[in-house]
Amino acid sequence: MKGLNANIIKYIVPVLILTALVSCKRKISFPSPLGYDFNNAEKFNMPESLLEISGIAFYKDKGDTVYSIQDEDGRFFRQGWMNKKQKHTQFASKDDYEDVAILNETVFVLRSDGVIFTFPFAERTQEEVKNIKIFKDILPKGEYESIYADNQTNQVYLLCKNCKNDKKDKSMSGSIFTYNQEKKELIPSGTFSMDVSGMIEREEILKTGLKASALTRDAHSGEWYILSSVNKVLVIASPDWKVKSVIRLNSSEFNQPEGLAFDDQMSLYISNEGDELSAGNILKFKHKP
């Protein structure tokens, strides 16, 4: 009997170990916003020139061509969707460029110190941009990574990643400008803030705050989508900046999420910077009613 028990144990133990290993390797399902499946992405790997892709945008919300910038080079890139070959125009020298938006026929590029570069979208095919305008000292001092342009209202929204009073107030502050296309001017049109204290108390984000890295808006619901690479979360807020939900992102799928945009089919796109082991990429999530 002892020999029989020993033989049973001899065969059962390896089976149990194998079962445990298989269970560990099973894909963990992460939460998704309503209408999207963050466990089922269409992945577009970037070329080496866009390893540090830091912002994405679409022209008139058309998803066939993606426009982007990367962290260090003052270049405005364009690619057909799922076409790795990129073309670009030079709009500035090397610096720290964090986000991009296209407002009708004008491109907006945000530098980390809050300086905004604008130039005609029509110049995207030129080797170098000729008609560039730079807006300095129009934002409160701080670090900025998020810009969104509303084609219907001609308004531009910017979020502060690190601003003096935000940590103390447990809030995230932002600024609104209206763009005068004819005069090529940004007119101050208000400020806003979002209370992040609840997220801090629930330990959904760090005590240092949300640290927004990208911003976009659902044109149908008016809801704001705010990405935080530091906290690995996507926050969805009401049109008046009240937090509605916080989506925890899978760090193995979202390596360093820095860019965010919708197309006219309501597909949601999130770009990720690459590193020594992986290429930069853009993840597309199709909308499911």
Predicted regions: what is each one?
Residues 1-34:
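Bacterial Sec-dependent N-terminal signal peptides
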